[in-house]
Amino acid sequence: MVGIIDVHCHILPGVDDGAQTLEESKKMLELEYQEGVRTVFATPHFRRRMFESSMEKIEQQYQKVKEIACGIGDGMDVFLACEYHVNMEIVEDLNSKVRPTVAGSSYVLAEFSGNSDFSFMRERAYDLISNGYRPIFAHVERYRCLGEKIERVEELARLGAYMQVNAGSIIGEDGWKVKRFCKRMMQEDLLHFVGTDGHGMKYRVPHIAQCAQYMEKKMGQAYTKKILIENPSEIIKTQQEGIGENNGTDTE
């Protein structure tokens, strides 16, 4: 499938635990292009006292990677985003533009600790939504409080949260229980986005083609296109609805 949008990738070099060099970023982009990806959301971590690269450095690396992407192949592009580690101050940080939203839109890629309580997740989702943000729960299959409790995922979705899972999890790279959980999310129409969560060319390599093939086989082409292309395309289309400035992304 061509035209895939990778909504979760640590492709900016030297700003977190993802790509470490510009050459590695280039190789990641080349691989993504070969696997049908045409847009990548660069999502460097932001976590207090752990991942706090300056926005100046992030912007510089983003511009370099975006320029490389343009030379990879027709239609290849990169948009700036961030993977926020959720804490009590996330709304304040977003309002203060400490880090960008996803492609300058109102969507926010939100990561929780694996052992976060469900009540904490629900409260933070409510805080974000009531302040005009649209939280995307990053790699939702990892959170212990959700486990195979699909009704909790449904409750978060009813609040207005969106769910992202990793491509590798869908095809069983994290075990059969996680694979089954992801499959049920698809069957219950609770999955909204898929990302590679790519971190480099040796660790968490940004593969997605096999996932796309699996999804087509199990759920059909129309569903796969909706999750991998159409849903993330809506983020780009609505970026001018974002809160404040567009944080370095392109606008029409």
Residue ranges and their predicted role:
Residues 11-22, 108-116, 170:
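Active-site mouth loops of central-metabolism enzymes
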Residues 5-7, 41-43, 79-82, 136-138, ...:
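Active-site neighborhood of phospho(di)ester-bond hydrolases with catalytic His/Asp-centered motifs
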Residues 208, 212-252:
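Mid-to-C-terminal alpha-helical segments outside catalytic/metal-binding sites
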Residues 33, 129, 186-187:
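Non-catalytic positions within long, well-ordered alpha-helices that form the structural scaffold/packing
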Residues 46-50, 85-87, 142-146, 170-173, ...:
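Active-site environment of divalent metal-dependent phosphoester hydrolases
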Residues 52-164, 242-243, 248-251:
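Extended substrate/RNA-proximal surfaces in nucleic-acid metabolism proteins
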Residues 190-206:
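Short acidic/histidine-rich active-site segments
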Residues 1-75:
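An N-terminally biased module of ancient metal coordination in phosphate/nucleic-acid-related enzymes
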